Each structure stands twice: as structure tokens, then as C-alpha cells.
Amino acid sequence: MRMESLADRLDACQEKLLDLYEKDSNKLEDQILHWHYVRLENAMLFKARQAGLTRVGHQMVPTLSVTKGKAHKAIEVHLSLQGLQTSAYAHEPWTLQTTSLEMWNTQPQRCWKKKGRRLTVKFDGEDHKAVEYVSWGYIYVQSTETDLWYKVPGKVSYKGLYYEMEGQEHYYVTFAQEAQKYGETGKWEVHMGNTVIYEPCASVSSTQDAVREVSTAETAGHLRDNTTQTTTTPTCVGPTQTSTSVQTPPHKRQRLHRDREQQPDTTQKDNHKRVDSTDQWINGHRNSTETGDNCDSYSSPVIHLKGDPNKLKCFRYRLQHSVPELFDKASSTWHWAGGQSTTRAAFVTLWYVNVEQRKQFLNRVTIPKGIQATAGYMSMCI
């Protein structure tokens, strides 16, 4: 009779759970009721196993340790939701999924999370070492001191995933620890949509720690636009200096001026197509019969980066430490020191071994917002 009574009570409890599953409510009071019955179900199974029963009706009774562990978890979640019901967030939508045990145990543990979005961390900057994580839009945390509930936004930095509460940062995923498992160099990149967070540059203001990136497709389009508009004559420019300020001797500036006068307008040409050529320079001047991007054997494909000096320095630092194999040389930050240019913008020039290397660079690297990139060719006889 005792076993039959226990079986009836267990059946009634499980019927209530089925009703709640079918209801699929988004109200917190229904989720509290759900966990009340889960708690009751596990308590009955625990008592049955404690009494030596291995079956109640048609249901097998798990081991004592399993039923005890499930009962404790159900009590923990049930009490948490009861506390949440007294907060200002009780009338928000709460579903079976958002109040599940899996959600409770997901990092950050012992709190509730909503609006998760995936991000990818590329350890050592390599695609095959990419690991996905979830950054939460909102995290509901109960203060251990006051028992009050706080709704705080989830945040992402180069260091990891965290939230701030009562003036303190709480990291629940630390990428440095993850790098020990998935990487070798101790470096990584955080990719979140069109945003990429690189390693902060110590020599640059902290405001540059996280730079919003533009997608590769947008970067390529931007490069094409800039090349057409700003490099109407992608000439093989003479040697450039790598000091902070580029100052060319007067006679060399005159030579460059003569070279440009002898080149035809190439605004209607494909500025990205390079044709191999032999001796295109005659007595120090470029052969005027050559058109487009036909440069002499000393020319190399380059990209000129234009923008704020600090941002350029930081970006160059990141490139040198994350993808040094994707370019040949990088200049120091330089400025125009003469002529009619009044801009205060700085430049960094990247040299490439060949066009294919530059293409690989553009396919893998996104140009930060605020930095303008222009492709072209420069003489490398230095």
C-alpha cells in the first residue's frame, strides 16, 4: 500500500510537469511552479531509494547519490527563482529554456542569462585554433551581501568575458587561461561580428584597446574606391625614407614630378592588375609608353595606411606580432613635410613581396575603422 501511494503521488507530480511543458509559458510564476514539481519529484525518488526501493511503479529509481544530487540542484534553482520573483525583473519573459538547469550551470554559473551571442577567439591568430564562446547581453546576478538582484550587461575585452557589479569586474572566461589549452604563443584575437579586438598596444592610449573593424568585403571595396580616387597615376615612386617625417631632397622631388608628367592618366585602368615588365626606366625616367600599373623590376606592391598616428602605431604593432608573414616590411609613421598638403594625418606604408602576398593580407586582415588604406606600387631600389 505504501509503495502504491508513493507511485500515485509520483505519477501526479509528473502529470503536473507534463502540463507545464505543454503550456510552454513565459511567466516566472509558471517556471517557479515547474521547479517546485521537479524538486518534489527528486525528493520522492531520493526517499524511495533511501528506503531500498529500486522501482516505483514502472519507473526505475536512480542511485542514492544521483537522486540526492538532482534534489539539491532542484532546491537551489527553485530558491533562486523565488528570490528573482521579488525583484524588479519578475515581469520580464522567463521561459523553460531561460530558467533551465543548463542555463543555471552555464558560465557565469549560479546566475541567469539572456540574449547570448556567439564570438570567436582565434588563438595564435590561426583559423584552425578558433574557439567559440557565448557573450551574454544581460546577466541577472544576486548580491551575496544584500540578496538583491542586479541586471547587468555582459561585456567583452581582450582579457575575457565579464560583467561589472557594484564597481567590480567579474571575469567568468579568461582568455589567457584558455590560451594555455588552445594556443602556443599566448596571443589571440577576439572576433565578434565585424568587431575584432587585438592585443592592447602598451605604447598607445587605452582608448585604442578595442578598435571596431570593417569586414573583409568592405575593406576590399574601400581599397578599390580609394585607389581609383586618390591614385590616378599609380607610379613607381622613388625611394622613401622610414623616419617619422619623410623629407625628400629637392632634386629628387623634381625627378618624381617629371616622372609623373610623362605617365598617362590611369583613372580608367584597372589599378589592381600588374603586368610584368623589363627595363621600363630609360636614363632615370619612366618610359612614357608604359601605362597603368606597369612598374619596373624594382617596384613592389604596397598599401599606404592613413589615419591617426597612435592608431596607426597600434595597428602596425598588432600586425607585426600577429601576422608578420603577411607582409615584407612596415615603415615607421611618416607625414608629408612639404608641398601643398595641409593634412595632419600620418601614414604607415606596408611593402609586400608580390601581389599574391598583398591579396592574402587583404583576405585575412581587416582594416580598423578610422584608417584609410590605399593600394599601389613603390620603387624598392633601396
Curated annotation (Swiss-Prot):
Q: What is its main location?
A: host cell
Q: Which residues cross the membrane?
A: none
Bias category Polar residues: which stretches?
278-294
Indicate, by first and last residue, each region the UniProt record lists as having compositional bias (Basic and acidic residues): 258-277
Gene Ontology biological process terms in this record: DNA replication; DNA-templated transcription; regulation of DNA replication; viral DNA genome replication
The UniProt entry, under InterPro entries, shows: E2/EBNA1_C_sf, Nucleotide-bd_a/b_plait_sf, Papillomavirus_E2_C, PPV_E2_N, Reg_prot_E2, Regulatory_protein_E2_N, Regulatory_protein_E2_N_1, Regulatory_protein_E2_N_2
Cellular component GO terms held in the UniProt record: host cell nucleus
Processing and modification events after translation? Phosphorylated. Sumoylation plays a regulatory role in E2 transcriptional activity.
Q: Where does this polypeptide localize?
A: Host nucleus
Region named Disordered? 213-294
- Give start-end positions of Low complexity composition bias: 227-249
List UniProt keywords, sorted A-Z: Activator, DNA replication, DNA-binding, Early protein, Host nucleus, Isopeptide bond, Phosphoprotein, Repressor, Transcription, Transcription regulation, Ubl conjugation
Q: Where is the signal peptide?
A: none
**Disulphide bridges, residue numbers:** none
Task: Report if keyword DNA-binding is assigned.
Answer: yes
What SUPFAM superfamilies does its record include?
E2 regulatory, transactivation domain, Viral DNA-binding domain
Region feature (Transactivation domain)? 1-204
Q: Where is this region: DNA-binding domain?
A: 299-382
Give the position of the cross-link Glycyl lysine isopeptide (Lys-Gly) (interchain with G-Cter in SUMO).
306
Report the GO molecular function annotations. Answer: DNA binding; DNA-binding transcription factor activity; nucleotide binding
Name the family: Belongs to the papillomaviridae E2 protein family.
Q: How does it assemble?
A: Binds DNA as homodimer. Interacts with protein E1; this interaction greatly increases E1 DNA-binding activity. Interacts with protein L1; this interaction enhances E2-dependent replication and transcription activation. Interacts with protein L2; this interaction inhibits E2 transcriptional activity but not DNA replication function E2. Interacts with protein E7; this interaction inhibits E7 oncogenic activity. Interacts with host TAF1; this interaction modulates E2-dependent transcriptional regulation. Interacts with host BRD4; this interaction mediates E2 transcriptional activation function.
Q: What does this protein do?
A: Plays a role in the initiation of viral DNA replication. A dimer of E2 interacts with a dimer of E1 in order to improve specificity of E1 DNA binding activity. Once the complex recognizes and binds DNA at specific sites, the E2 dimer is removed from DNA. E2 also regulates viral transcription through binding to the E2RE response element (5'-ACCNNNNNNGGT-3') present in multiple copies in the regulatory regions of the viral genome. Activates or represses transcription depending on E2RE's position with regards to proximal promoter elements including the TATA-box.
Per its record, how is this protein called by name?
Answer: Regulatory protein E2
